[in-house]
């Protein structure tokens, strides 16, 4: 066995090199790749042209400017606030509006520091080589997060207009700030461990350092507003509505966005994860008073149906994905068929997503919002006709609905990003359906909206939906289907996943 573990043999390499240099095609590819980027040489121009900005269904009805997270990992906050601003702009018929991302991120840093210090007190006797403690020490206050964290921050601290708390240099360029807060937290940890025999002394140290971090945040982000005035100009009538002495919470009430109705749903083909089951991410909490993050899993068809339901009902859809694959920034496209790496390097991109997740080839790292999709109407008419002909002699069930969703021929999706207007198509991006199935793993949906959609799914006619079986009078078809697709999953006892799970990775793209 040891003989097989030999060192790199220079002669073997020279022999291989000599063989390659005899191959004219290798010379051609080498000359091209040495002087150009891999992506520019491997790009498939025939495929990239089909990913244009034309969509059969697009809900983006506002003229709101694209947001820009700049050199920070605040994507999860930007995507959450972009969801609610779409509703706010439509409800108030205004030209543009933006919520302050820095306001929420200010308190995100403070809450993370508080949670970390409490964890360090709880683990004061744990050896620093412990796997959990090692993970916590590696990433105490980075920019990343999840939808639920944004949800909790908004409900606790409210929201303010961006005009009341603009991006500071440090909120838009967080690297140095994060390092400084990290140093403070590690200094606190040293003092806590030196005083571990006294519980009160440890908490006094915690409070001292938390106030010091609060001072750093005030110095670098600015002071969060407590009260403010707001004027909203109707873009049609030019009438101006004025609001005085708003607080972040009274302003939140005026938005009328039911955050408690929204839940995170995941589709993951990872073999160690059950479908239609709730999961809890250990140590994934941004506030001491909140528990760990919980998400629910569904199958691929249900996942697609939920995304369609939100968009058909004109609701922006927060989603999380892995943006590190098959991306063309100039065109603003993510698609599996953009590049032909296989011809150059014999790298086969198989569809064994379970292995990709297990071996950390893929993991969610960025959040954006879906704003629309494009499907082939003629192909859909054909698929429906064939399917209903095949099942005409029986009442249809929720499984038939999922089969039809599978047959619904989406070609591409419209995405609103938070990377500014200079990237993509003025800040908007395209993702192919194949890429969606490969790299989109989480969506955030409104339970009420899903039930509303299931009263008569928009992609089916009322006549065809009537073919689905009816239920007892005390339960509507919509409610019954909702429970089968999603509701029953919410009743399952959460299974806890460790901090080193592939799913316990913060979004900071």
Each PLM stretch: what is its role?
Residues 5-28, 65-67, 78-81, 88, ...:
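Bimodal feature
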Residues 292-365, 380:
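Long, positively charged binding patches that form subdomain-scale interaction surfaces
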Residues 50-318, 376, 413, 423-425, ...:
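Active-site nucleophile-adjacent alpha helix/oxyanion-hole segment immediately C-terminal to the catalytic cysteine
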Residues 371, 376, 382-388, 392-509:
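Conserved catalytic-core surface of thiol
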Residues 4-64:
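N-terminal regions that are enriched for targeting/export leaders
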Residues 282-286, 352-359, 400-409:
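Intrinsically disordered, low-complexity acidic Ser/Thr-rich regulatory segments
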């Amino acid at each position: 066995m040891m003989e097989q573990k030999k060192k790199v043999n220079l002669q073997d390499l020279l022999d291989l090199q000599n063989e390659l240099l005899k191959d004219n095609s290798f010379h051609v590819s080498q000359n091209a790749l040495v002087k150009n980027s891999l992506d520019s040489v491997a790009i498939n121009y025939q495929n990239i042209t089909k990913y244009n900005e034309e969509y059969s269904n697009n809900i983006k009805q506002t003229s709101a400017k694209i947001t820009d997270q700049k050199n920070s990992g605040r994507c999860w906050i930007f995507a959450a606030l972009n969801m609610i601003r779409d509703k706010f702009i439509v409800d108030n018929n205004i030209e543009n509006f933006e919520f302050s991302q820095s306001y929420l991120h200010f308190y995100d840093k403070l809450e993370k520091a508080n949670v970390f210090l409490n964890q360090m007190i709880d683990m004061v006797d744990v050896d620093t080589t412990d796997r959990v403690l090692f993970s916590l020490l590696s990433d105490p206050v980075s920019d990343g997060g999840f939808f639920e964290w944004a949800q909790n921050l908004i409900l606790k601290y409210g929201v303010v207009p961006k005009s009341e708390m603009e991006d500071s240099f440090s909120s838009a360029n967080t690297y140095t700030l994060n390092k400084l807060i990290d140093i403070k937290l590690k200094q606190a940890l040293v003092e806590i461990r030196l005083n571990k025999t006294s519980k009160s002394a440890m908490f006094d140290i915690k409070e001292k350092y938390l106030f010091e971090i609060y001072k750093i945040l005030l110095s670098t982000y600015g002071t969060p507003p407590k009260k403010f005035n707001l004027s909203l100009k109707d873009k049609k009538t030019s009438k101006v509505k004025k609001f005085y002495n708003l607080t972040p919470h009274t302003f939140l009430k005026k938005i009328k966005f039911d955050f408690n109705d929204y839940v995170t749903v995941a589709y993951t083909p990872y073999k160690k994860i059950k479908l239609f089951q709730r999961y809890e991410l250990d140590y994934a909490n941004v506030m001491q008073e909140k528990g760990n993050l919980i998400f629910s899993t569904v199958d691929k068809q249900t996942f697609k149906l939920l995304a369609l339901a939100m968009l058909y009902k004109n609701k922006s859809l927060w989603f999380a994905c892995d943006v590190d694959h098959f991306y063309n920034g100039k065109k603003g496209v993510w698609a599996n068929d953009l590049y032909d790496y296989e011809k150059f390097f014999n790298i086969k991109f198989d569809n064994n997503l379970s292995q990709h997740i297990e071996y950390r080839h893929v993991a969610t790292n960025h959040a954006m919002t879906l704003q629309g999709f494009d499907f082939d109407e003629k192909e859909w008419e054909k698929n429906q006709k064939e399917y209903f002909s095949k099942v005409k002699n029986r009442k249809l069930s929720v499984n038939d609905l999922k089969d039809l969703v599978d047959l619904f021929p989406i070609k591409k999706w419209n995405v609103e990003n938070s990377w500014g207007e200079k990237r993509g198509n003025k800040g908007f991006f395209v993702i192919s359906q194949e890429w969606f199935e490969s790299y989109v793993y989480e969506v955030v949906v409104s339970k009420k909206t899903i039930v509303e959609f299931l009263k008569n799914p928009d992609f089916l006619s009322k006549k065809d939906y009537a073919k689905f079986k009816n239920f007892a009078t005390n339960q509507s078809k919509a409610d019954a289907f909702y429970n089968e697709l999603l509701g029953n999953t919410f009743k399952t006892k959460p299974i806890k996943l460790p901090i080193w799970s592939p799913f316990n990775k913060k979004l900071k793209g």
